[in-house]
């Protein structure tokens, strides 16, 4: 296929906008002949060719009109059938229609007065515009045909990596279709401007690489390093994961000379990476100090761990001090991870704020024709782009989300290559500020840049947690509020305006991201609470803050400065911080104590990407920004109904488990705790099949299944300990049988967790199906839930058996403690509301005076009965 592709590439000459297929060339030839015949005159002198009889001008004009109408009809049909380039084709058809009408009027006027040079010039310009519009329509139609063929070829590919490459190549062709036209047109119109050639060559190279990628993926000949150039989790995250695995050693085979240098070398490599992040310009001083402190703590924990290994050398079992040292080591590496994530989020929060400002400033300078300013702002724009790429790579370095890291790196590569071309488009516009072609070229590159920045932002958001984002945003807004107050007191209008704009941008980003996050959950008390906090911030707090900023700037800008209420501004600023803090508190409401660490951060190791948006590369619609969960939500109604039936059956089983665990106090009873955890995770997995819940991608579901398997293993260990102490053989056998069911159903759930909606393109229509995989997942979860219920009951029965036999000695040291859950406490006396106590006045009853003798006599009388 490669040999067949090369001649096509060589025949495609962007200078003349020559199309790439003979079929389209034959379609264009009649119109070119008719138009050129109409506009040609004898100005070039007498011809040596044999004279003949030319058609009348009116006849040629009608022929041009008919040919144009034919293109319009075909173009409208192609636009109607196209899925990928519908909007571009519709715009191209309308352009041909407009230029055709202009040509019809101009040719008619010229035919009536063929001696008029003015009318002839008007017609020549109209003819050129018509040919340009028709050529663009044919290029787009050709591209649509190529993409349609590629879609069918992509379905036939078996290797997922090849399908991904094919999808990426299709996306590149679609992206570069319009850019190819505008860049080539700008180069043709302004060949003396060097930047136009750079733009044209860049787009042409992108198309060449896309076609080469199609050839490679179709033949599965992509080089290994090219296939996996962006694959793998972050380097720092991988090093930390490997270090955590390496610290688990067997004391029996431990050798200090062998293991100490290796572990210390690995740790120093990790600390070097952490130090680079700490020394970065966007890292706050307090964050830098925390990272340094955590690095020192990890060093010390490693030395303590190695000392314990030396003390336990030659032993078969690990002692409690050694286990404690391992736990401490793991905790310290986890703390270091948290600080590194926070440092990365510092960078993201600062760099991905108002990402379009450098571009807009560059374009405004280009429109004014000031090439010197354009070069100055181009440097600022280049630094901004480099910062985005740098921060994106930092985010990748600490992420465990392999799929997300791949997408971020691909998006960052696109940003890096597109940046110089945006500058070239601006230089072209600065050199020819009155040129509509240069302006159109700038607009296309501007749109492409903004789209790529959005993709990069969403991809970076996808590998960071919402909780880290909220924590850092809260701190940054507090910093900016303090800066605003200081600038206000010092009368620094520029700093006040700039910092207030940053506060508005941060608050708007919080609102946008948390609104998107709440779409992952079913409506309920939790989502209502969060959405109320968001509404309060966006509709009440921020308008008041903006109003106070405007008043303050207006008062300080006058000469002399006018007095104003400083306290009003401070109160409005404080409310912004309080509003973001309230949103964070509302989001953290459903976190478990294990998830809420020292600074209320959600420690997310397996779920490193439970967040806003997801961009997949498995299907074209996923590239457009839809997650696997969103695709599940697009299943046909018949499949949704069947899934709903399965979910209802699962809920009935869940209610049984809820009723069982609700009876017991989970303090000292890890079996109940594990049952609750497994129930919660299984509920999230079933929600995924309906396009709901926090799980977004197949990797999230797989990680959830792993968590359930881990919980099942821990429950198996506890329940077997209960069974070992049970003297009743029947109860013991029942409990062990239920444990075998848990192991089986955990394995089934792990297999079914690969649930994924299948998307097929049949006849240009996307067909989404996923009933079998979804129902299998729900059924496996239902079976596991039933096994957990039976295990909890059997564990309690077995515990009662061995307590009866062994007496109080067993009761005092059980494997788990079975205590009935205490009822909720209720006040014995109804408490009055404070406002009622203040307003209600009651008349006290008259106090009765009873003599002691009378009371004693009554007491004796009652005693006599």
Curated annotation (Swiss-Prot):
Membrane topology: Peripheral membrane protein
Superkingdom of origin: Eukaryota
GO CC field: adherens junction; axon; catenin complex; cytoplasm; cytoskeleton; nucleus
Compositionally biased residues, Basic and acidic residues: 823-839
GO MF entries: actin filament binding; beta-catenin binding; cadherin binding
Residues spanning the signal sequence: none
GO biological process: axonogenesis; brain morphogenesis; cell migration; cell-cell adhesion; dendrite morphogenesis; regulation of synapse structural plasticity
Coiled-coil intervals, chain numbering: none
Localization in the cell: Cell membrane; Cytoplasm; Cytoplasm, Cytoskeleton; Cell junction, Adherens junction
Region described as Disordered: spans on this chain: 823-851
Basic residues bias spans: 840-850
Keyword Nucleus: yes
Alphabetically ordered keywords of this record: Cell adhesion, Cell junction, Cell membrane, Cell projection, Cytoplasm, Cytoskeleton, Developmental protein, Differentiation, Membrane, Nucleus
Protein task: May function as a linker between cadherin adhesion receptors and the cytoskeleton to regulate cell-cell adhesion and differentiation in the nervous system.
UniProt similarity note: Belongs to the vinculin/alpha-catenin family.
Name of the protein described by the UniProt record: Catenin alpha-2
Underlying gene: Ctnna2
């Amino acid at each position: 296929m490669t040999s067949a592709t090369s001649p096509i590439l060589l025949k495609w000459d962007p200078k003349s906008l020559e199309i790439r297929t003979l079929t389209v060339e034959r379609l264009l030839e009649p119109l070119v002949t008719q138009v050129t015949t109409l506009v040609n005159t004898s100005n070039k002198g007498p011809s040596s060719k044999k004279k003949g009889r030319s058609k009348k001008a009116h006849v040629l004009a009608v022929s041009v009109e008919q040919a144009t109408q034919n293109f319009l009809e075909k173009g409208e049909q192609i636009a109607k059938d196209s899925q990928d380039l519908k909007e571009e084709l519709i715009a191209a058809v309308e352009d041909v229609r407009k230029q055709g009408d202009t040509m019809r009027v101009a040719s008619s006027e010229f035919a009536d007065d063929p001696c008029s040079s003015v009318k002839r010039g008007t017609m020549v310009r109209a003819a050129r515009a018509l040919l340009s519009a028709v050529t663009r329509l044919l290029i787009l139609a050709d591209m649509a045909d190529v993409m349609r063929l590629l879609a069918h070829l992509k379905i036939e590919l078996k290797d997922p990596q090849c399908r991904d490459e094919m999808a990426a190549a299709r996306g590149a062709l679609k992206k570069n279709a319009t850019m190819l036209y505008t860049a080539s047109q700008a180069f043709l119109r302004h060949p003396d401007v060097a930047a136009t050639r750079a733009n044209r060559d860049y787009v042409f190279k992108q198309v060449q690489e896309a076609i080469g990628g199609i050839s490679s993926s179709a033949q599965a000949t992509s080089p290994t390093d090219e296939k996996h150039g962006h694959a793998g989790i972050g380097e720092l995250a991988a090093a930390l994961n490997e270090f955590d695995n390496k610290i688990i050693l067997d004391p029996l085979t431990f050798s200090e000379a062998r293991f100490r240098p290796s572990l210390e070398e690995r740790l120093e490599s990790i600390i070097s990476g952490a130090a680079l992040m700490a020394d970065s310009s966007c890292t706050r001083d307090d964050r830098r100090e925390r990272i340094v402190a955590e690095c020192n703590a990890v060093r010390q924990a490693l030395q303590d761990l190695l000392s314990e290994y030396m003390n336990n050398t030659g032993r078969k079992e690990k002692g409690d001090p050694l286990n404690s040292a391992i736990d401490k080591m793991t905790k310290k590496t986890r703390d270091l991870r948290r600080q590194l994530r926070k440092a990365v989020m510092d960078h993201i929060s600062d760099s991905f704020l108002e990402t379009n400002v450098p571009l807009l400033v560059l374009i405004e300078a280009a429109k004014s024709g000031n090439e010197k300013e354009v070069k100055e702002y181009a440097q600022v724009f280049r630094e901004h782009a480099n910062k985005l790429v740098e921060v994106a790579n930092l985010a990748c370095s600490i992420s465990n989300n392999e799929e997300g890291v791949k997408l971020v790196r691909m998006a960052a590569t696109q940003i890096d290559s597109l940046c110089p071309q945006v500058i070239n488009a601006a230089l072209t516009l600065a050199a020819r500020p009155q040129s509509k072609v240069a302006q159109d070229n700038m607009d296309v590159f501007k749109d492409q840049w903004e789209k790529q920045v959005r993709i990069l932002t969403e991809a970076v958001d996808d590998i960071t947690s919402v909780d880290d984002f909220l924590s850092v945003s809260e701190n940054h807004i507090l910093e900016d509020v303090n800066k605003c107050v200081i600038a206000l007191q010092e009368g620094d209008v520029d700093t006040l305006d700039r910092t207030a704009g940053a506060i508005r941008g941060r608050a708007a980003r919080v609102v946008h991201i948390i609104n998107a996050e709440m779409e992952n959950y079913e409506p309920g008390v939790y989502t209502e609470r969060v959405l109320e906090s968001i509404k309060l911030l966006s509709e009440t707090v921020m308008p008041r803050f903006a109003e106070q900023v405007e008043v303050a700037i207006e008062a300080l800008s006058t000469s002399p400065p006018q007095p104003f209420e400083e306290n009003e501004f401070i109160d409005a600023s404080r409310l912004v911080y309080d509003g973001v803090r309230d949103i964070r508190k509302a989001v953290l409401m459903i976190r478990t104590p294990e998830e809420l660490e020292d600074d209320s951060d959600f420690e997310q190791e397996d779920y490193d990407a439970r967040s806003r948006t997801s961009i997949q590369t498995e299907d074209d619609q996923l590239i457009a920004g839809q997650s696997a969960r969103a695709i599940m939500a697009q299943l046909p109604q018949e499949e949704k109904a069947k899934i709903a039936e399965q979910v209802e059956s699962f809920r009935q089983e869940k209610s049984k488990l809820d009723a069982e665990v609700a009876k017991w106090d989970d303090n000292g009873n890890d079996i109940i705790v594990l049952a609750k955890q497994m129930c919660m995770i299984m509920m999230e997995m079933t929600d995924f099949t309906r396009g709901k819940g926090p799980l977004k991608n197949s990797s999230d579901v797989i990680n959830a299944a792993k968590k359930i398997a881990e919980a099942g293993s821990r429950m198996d260990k506890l329940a077997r300990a209960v069974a070992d102490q049970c003297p009743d053989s029947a109860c013991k056998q029942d409990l062990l049988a239920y444990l075998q069911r848990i192991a089986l159903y955990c394995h089934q759930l792990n297999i079914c967790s690969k649930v994924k909606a299948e998307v097929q393109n049949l006849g240009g229509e996307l067909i989404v199906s996923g009933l079998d995989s979804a129902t299998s997942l729900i059924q496996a979860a239902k079976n596991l839930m039933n096994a957990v219920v039976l295990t909890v009951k059997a564990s309690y029965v077995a515990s009662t058996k061995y307590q009866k036999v062994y007496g109080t000695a067993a009761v005092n040291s059980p494997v788990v403690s079975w205590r009935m859950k205490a009822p909720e406490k209720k006040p014995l006396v109804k408490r009055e509301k404070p406002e009622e106590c203040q307003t209600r006045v009651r008349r006290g009853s008259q106090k009765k005076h009873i003599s002691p003798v009378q009371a004693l006599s009554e007491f004796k009388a009652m005693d006599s009965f």
